Amino acid sequence: MYAYKGFEPDLSCRGYRFVMGKNVTPEANCASNGFHCAEDPLDCLSYYGDMNRSIYCLVQPGGDIDEDDRDSKIACTELTILRQLTRKEFFLHALAYICLLYTSDAADEL
């Protein structure tokens, strides 16, 4: 599974400083703890909306995973930061996600 995460320019999020590669925490709950990311890149904009200041990365969630029922947000106990995305890459990933949702929804209706 791959997901997306927004960060402050120094790779921090809510006071925690992430590092490239694997990051580990003991608990994962979408409402209160764990490392958060989103399956839909565009959901990152709800939390890190200033694209001129924030950075966005392709990540791989692992360990215990808790999913949110409001959007595609995920909390996990392991988060591997794979790489930073350029703005163009971010929107290409978002478009691919939308196309994947559309084609899977369309296939379900057949």
Give residue spans per PLM region.
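Negatively charged, Asp/Glu-rich surface segments that serve as flexible interaction/assembly modules
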Residues: E67-L101
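Generic structural motif
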Residues: F7-P9, P61-D64, Q84
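Generic surface-pattern signal
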Residues: P9, G49-D50, A96-L100
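ADP-ribose/NAD+-binding catalytic cleft of ART/PARP-like enzymes
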Residues: M1-N33, N52-I55
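Conserved small/polar residues in nucleotide/adenosyl-binding loops
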Residues: Y102-A107
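Extended, polar beta-sheet/loop recognition surfaces of beta-rich domains
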Residues: L110
